[in-house]
């Protein structure tokens, strides 16, 4: 696997929940994250929803489809409580067991990604508790996470399907912490007391210990993956001196996130962003292979497309047809005696004109929809192509995410989510080519 470029997709929102990816799961509550969903839902209802969701969100058919697209890896985010040894959290490790069976059946590798920690490592909803980031300040919880990693390594270390284990997802830097929209937004202010960014010194120490413990239970042909902590260029010396074998540095690169801070949402800006990222990646790869573990083609340039060439055209067609009808009616009524016998023809003409209007507007709407879809497809493919060219300089890439919002049709207000959904991107021709395999 190490000699082969990684081409993968994340199985997000399966074992680690994110409200924006499937709001239906959070219905009836105002919870922003999984922790508060668990606190607010009655226990029986929570159990029912979680079971229904986990049984259906990812199935064997999904992994078969993924393999059929020519991908070779799935990254599976898992929560810190997946072994179910802390009440009231239930085990979900059996679903990870299933994923390994399916992955091995279809020739896929699995990257296990420890996505959350007790107390959160970034303050995001994907860390399980919005606005709280204090895991790293509690030595007992740090030790607990290390034991979770050890158990994962012992359980799956010799599985054919294991690519590796990522020890921690997105531990947050000072800069990102202080610019994140979730910082300071904890529902329980007391619970967030002591929150702050994850210092680089702590992270290096934690990574070294995590590597040591994983290597005690996991062979060297299985990779250990470290997230860059939003500090991509800070790791050169660390990996040169560490004496580590078969390790990767994971970086997450989102144009969508970059756009939040810039007023220009155009391809030339994307090229500048990607060019800078590629320059940094090439520099870091002299010390360690770099993996783009999360990215997507969602951009404001494509998601919020409006084509002004077609605006108003439907009104023009409708107005023209109604004007013709009105002029004909006026001419008949102006000389009613002479045209008394034409009343039947007038009614027929009126019906034909109205039918013509309906057909013309339907045709216009169909053509406009097709034109907008093609324009949007071109824009998404342009972004996909420039990103994929950039990732060619890396050890590989993993798309975020496989699916969003189940199979339901997204509302107009949710249409921006399509670019995060790999299945829909493939089926709409925005990236790759769908296979029948």
Regions found by a protein language model. Name each.
Residues 64-70, 104-105, 154-160, 238-248, ...:
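Acidic (Asp/Glu)-rich catalytic clusters
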Residues 15-21, 258-259, 300-301, 408:
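Short, solvent-exposed loop/turn elements at domain surfaces
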Residues 47-74, 84, 88-116, 126-167, ...:
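An active-site-proximal structural segment forming one wall of the substrate-binding cleft
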Residues 161, 172-382:
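Extracellular glycoside hydrolase catalytic/binding regions
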Residues 80-95, 120-140, 175-182, 189-192, ...:
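Surface-exposed, active-site-proximal loop segments in enzymatic domains
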């Amino acid at each position: 696997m190490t000699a082969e470029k990684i081409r993968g997709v994340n199985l997000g929102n399966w074992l680690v929940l994110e409200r924006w990816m499937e709001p239906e799961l959070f219905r009836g509550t105002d919870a922003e994250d999984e922790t508060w969903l668990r606190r607010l839902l009655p226990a029986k209802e929570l159990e029912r929803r979680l079971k229904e969701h986990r049984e259906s969100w990812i199935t064997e058919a999904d992994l078969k489809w993924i393999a059929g697209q020519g991908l070779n890896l799935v990254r599976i985010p898992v929560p810190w409580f997946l072994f179910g040894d802390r009440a009231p959290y239930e085990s979900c490790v059996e679903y990870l067991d299933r994923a390994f069976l399916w992955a091995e059946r279809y020739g896929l590798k699995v990257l296990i990604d420890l996505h959350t920690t007790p107390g959160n490592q970034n303050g995001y909803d994907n860390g399980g508790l919005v606005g709280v980031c204090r895991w790293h300040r509690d030595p007992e919880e740090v030790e607990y996470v290390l034991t979770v990693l050890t158990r994962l390594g012992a359980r799956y270390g010799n599985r054919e399907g294991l690519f590796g284990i990522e020890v921690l997802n997105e531990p947050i830097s000072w800069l990102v912490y202080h610019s994140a929209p979730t910082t300071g937004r904890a529902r329980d202010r007391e619970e967030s007391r002591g929150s702050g960014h994850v210092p680089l010194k702590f992270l290096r120490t934690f990574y070294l210990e995590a590597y040591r413990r994983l290597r005690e239970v996991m062979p060297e042909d299985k990779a250990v993956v470290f997230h860059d902590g939003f500090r991509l260029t800070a790791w050169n010396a660390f990996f040169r001196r560490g004496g580590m074998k078969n390790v990767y540095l994971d970086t997450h690169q989102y144009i969508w996130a970059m756009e939040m801070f810039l007023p220009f949402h155009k391809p030339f800006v994307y090229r500048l962003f990607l060019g800078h990222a590629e320059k940094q990646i090439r520099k870091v790869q002299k010390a360690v292979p770099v993996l783009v573990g999360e990215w997507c083609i969602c951009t404001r340039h494509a998601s919020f497309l409006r084509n002004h060439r077609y605006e108003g055209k439907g009104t023009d067609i409708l107005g023209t047809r109604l004007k013709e009808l009105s002029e004909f009616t006026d001419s008949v009524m102006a000389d009613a005696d002479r045209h008394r016998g034409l009343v039947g023809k007038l009614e027929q003409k009126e019906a034909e004109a109205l039918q013509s209007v309906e057909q013309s507007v339907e045709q216009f709407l169909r053509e406009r929809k097709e034109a907008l879809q093609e324009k949007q497809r071109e824009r998404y493919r342009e972004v996909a192509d420039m990103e994929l060219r950039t990732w060619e300089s890396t050890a590989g890439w993993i798309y975020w995410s496989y699916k969003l919002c189940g199979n339901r049709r997204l509302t107009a207000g949710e249409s921006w989510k399509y670019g995060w959904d790999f299945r829909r991107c493939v089926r709409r021709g925005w990236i790759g080519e769908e296979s029948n395999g």
